[in-house]
Amino acid sequence: MYLLFLFLLFPTVFSLNQDGFILQQVKLSLDDPDSYLSSWNSNDASPCRWSGVSCAGDFSSVTSVDLSSANLAGPFPSVICRLSNLAHLSLYNNSINSTLPLNIAACKSLQTLDLSQNLLTGELPQTLADIPTLVHLDLTGNNFSGDIPASFGKFENLEVLSLVYNLLDGTIPPFLGNISTLKMLNLSYNPFSPSRIPPEFGNLTNLEVMWLTECHLVGQIPDSLGQLSKLVDLDLALNDLVGHIPPSLGGLTNVVQIELYNNSLTGEIPPELGNLKSLRLLDASMNQLTGKIPDELCRVPLESLNLYENNLEGELPASIALSPNLYEIRIFGNRLTGGLPKDLGLNSPLRWLDVSENEFSGDLPADLCAKGELEELLIIHNSFSGVIPESLADCRSLTRIRLAYNRFSGSVPTGFWGLPHVNLLELVNNSFSGEISKSIGGASNLSLLILSNNEFTGSLPEEIGSLDNLNQLSASGNKFSGSLPDSLMSLGELGTLDLHGNQFSGELTSGIKSWKKLNELNLADNEFTGKIPDEIGSLSVLNYLDLSGNMFSGKIPVSLQSLKLNQLNLSYNRLSGDLPPSLAKDMYKNSFIGNPGLCGDIKGLCGSENEAKKRGYVWLLRSIFVLAAMVLLAGVAWFYFKYRTFKKARAMERSKWTLMSFHKLGFSEHEILESLDEDNVIGAGASGKVYKVVLTNGETVAVKRLWTGSVKETGDCDPEKGYKPGVQDEAFEAEVETLGKIRHKNIVKLWCCCSTRDCKLLVYEYMPNGSLGDLLHSSKGGMLGWQTRFKIILDAAEGLSYLHHDSVPPIVHRDIKSNNILIDGDYGARVADFGVAKAVDLTGKAPKSMSVIAGSCGYIAPEYAYTLRVNEKSDIYSFGVVILEIVTRKRPVDPELGEKDLVKWVCSTLDQKGIEHVIDPKLDSCFKEEISKILNVGLLCTSPLPINRPSMRRVVKMLQEIGGGDEDSLHKIRDDKDGKLTPYYNEDTSDQGSIA
């Protein structure tokens, strides 16, 4: 009866053999939206011709099933283990979900199991070790968690074990050292609990590849690893390893690549590494290594040498120039001295050379580009001298040239100006002379031309106007002369034009209206004449304008009022007429000095119409005041003597304040100090208390009083404790000075800093709509439409992207949250408190909650719990939380979410209920598609693994494409399955290496 039932139920599959019947069950258990399994026809006699299926030679039984990248979804099809001769199974890059069942052990003949890049969760099944024939096990890129099962130490034939990119959080177990057959061990990018490298791994004498990247390893590298004589690739990067590099690693006679970067290794590089004749790639960057670079190491035929950001001394051994295939040297950020080997580049296809931030001297080697492959020449902050070798003028492969802060002199070779692939040419702070060659017109890819503080002469060539990609032209502090070429006005991509401190003359023409992307214009201290063109007001993104120290005449264009300028300086010209009304404010009093013909209601300028009348009454007023003074003199005398002591103390107190200003100020530190009243407090957080201060000139500023030891305890600033600047104060001032130089429309302007030893005040521009967090979670939050919220997200992203990628030096915010995103009167967003956490910590008096934790509850990236390190990826995670907060209008940590934080709640609710239950119900449903895309960006930013989070520059691009309707970028998924990364994996590392 049972057979009859099967016959009636599946009449068409009786033609199939048993293996075909099993595969039909597999097909039914999986979701196949792309119909990848359409060739699996139940009418066939055998499945051996089906896509992804291979059979033994007699076509009687299935031995291999490969369904890689088939877009299949569903739980693991356990029924497939009924294929008695199945030796190879690959479901790589699908959406296989749920847990991997214990009955996987039923696949008794399995030799290869590849389930990488899926959505599997839960613990690793201990029964995997019960498959006696298993040779290759790849579970990379899933969401497995918990410990590695103890049974894994009992594999009998396993050669490959890859568990990369999971969520395993136990310790790395010593019993893996029992798998004597193992050739490849890859555990990289898992949040393991801090643990040491088990010395037992030295027993894996057949091991060829050991990748333990970013596994939270601590302690020293065990000497036993030197026993792995067959090892080809060793990667221990991105951990917390300490101690010396063991000389025993000289026993790795077959090793080709060693990656030790980003640890805390100390001591000298062992000369025993010179025994590694097969070594081609060595990266021990970002450690604390000392001593010299061993000559023995440089005699090995290396291809890539990365030792940057250590404390190495001495010279770069000349023997490095003999390596026949050397293509990369990155040794910046050390204390290396002497000259570069004179034959460097002569014998090898050198492509990337970065020796910045050392103490090198002498001439540049003439043969750096002898093989015609040099792309990056980065040597900033050294003491190189002499001239640029003529040979480099023929190096057409160059893309980035940074020779700044050296002692070069002489003319720049003619061909050097016109190299066709160069996008960055930086010659700052040298003694170069001569003119810019007309050949610069051939530099069609040039984006950044930075020539400041040299001795260049002549005029800018007309050919410079053909550089359509030019974004920055900085040539201040030279001896350029003549008029600006007309062609310069056609540079539509120009964002910064800084020509101050030269001898330029002529007029500024109306052609400047083409500079639609210009953010900074500095033509100060030249000899320009004529009127300031009205068209300057059409430069909508201009926020820095300095035309001081010229001979401009005529009226100030009324159109200037339409600009949102952070910096304006028109002083010391020949301007006349009335100030435009919105500029006639005391805060601009220093912006117009030295213009005798200029009139306005600012002290120092010629008077207004009523001023003459006012003078007529001066004599009468003086008489009245003198009489009143005589009447009150007796009473005032008593008060004078009574408070004389108080006034002296007050004067002493004020004298101890140090003011560091970053803009033209219309107020003094005394006015700020007198307004620090508890009635003016508008907020308080982990880094300090914020006051709203209305100034006498009518302007409003926000004053943040940073928490320090005494302030936190007493609640008051006490400057009478004897202020003596020290290292911590200098570090604080240096940090704040960096913050004060920031100029961006989406970053809150820092007016100035007032400080004593025990009190630090930061004065910011005031944002009338308060913080995003307060606005979003107040009664007004539900009235924020989607377009306003999207604008806030994009504005904040652009501000944070500027800090990460365009600020010099780059700045990590450390505490991105909705309360640190402020909203202006037009509901534009501005990032605030950037770097404040670091600045407070530099005082050495941060409260415990501040010094221990960088960030705010609910916004902190998960890896911080076990690394206690903050980088740009931490900011990106926090920004992703802000996106989710804006979309859902729920706080990151809320009793409504139960034991979950916002990220986990969004993920689980999306899976269980759908997006309708995630989005704020106050939002218009017509924006659902766009909101969904933004939500995906937020989830991408909050990826548990930092490596999977996009850079902020990429986030901005995705947001812009969503706003423009382009969704292609949202579906691009990185498919790396090997887990192997270098320090240069990010898409936005144009300034990787040295950044100045």
UniProtKB/Swiss-Prot annotation:
Membrane topology designation: Single-pass type I membrane protein
LRR repeat copies, ranges: 59-83, 84-107, 109-131, 133-154, 155-178, 179-203, 205-228, 229-252, 253-276, 278-299, 300-323, 325-347, 348-371, 373-395, 396-419, 421-443, 444-467, 468-491, 493-515, 516-539, 541-562, 563-586
PTM annotation (Phosphoserine): residues: 851
Amino-acid positions noted as binding ATP in the UniProt annotation, renumbered to this chain: 682-690, 704
One MF annotation (Gene Ontology) recorded for this entry: protein serine/threonine kinase activity
Leader sequence residues: 1-15
Chain positions with Phosphotyrosine modification: 764, 802, 859, 866
Active site (UniProt): 815 (proton acceptor)
Protein kinase domain sequence ranges: 676-962
Domain of life, per lineage: Eukaryota
Compartment(s) of residence: Cell membrane
Modified residues (Phosphothreonine): 867
Annotated stretches, region: Disordered: 967-996
Reaction catalyzed: L-seryl-[protein] + ATP = O-phospho-L-seryl-[protein] + ADP + H(+); L-threonyl-[protein] + ATP = O-phospho-L-threonyl-[protein] + ADP + H(+)
Protein known as: Receptor-like protein kinase HSL1
Organism lineage: Eukaryota, Viridiplantae, Streptophyta, Embryophyta, Tracheophyta
Gene (name only): HSL1
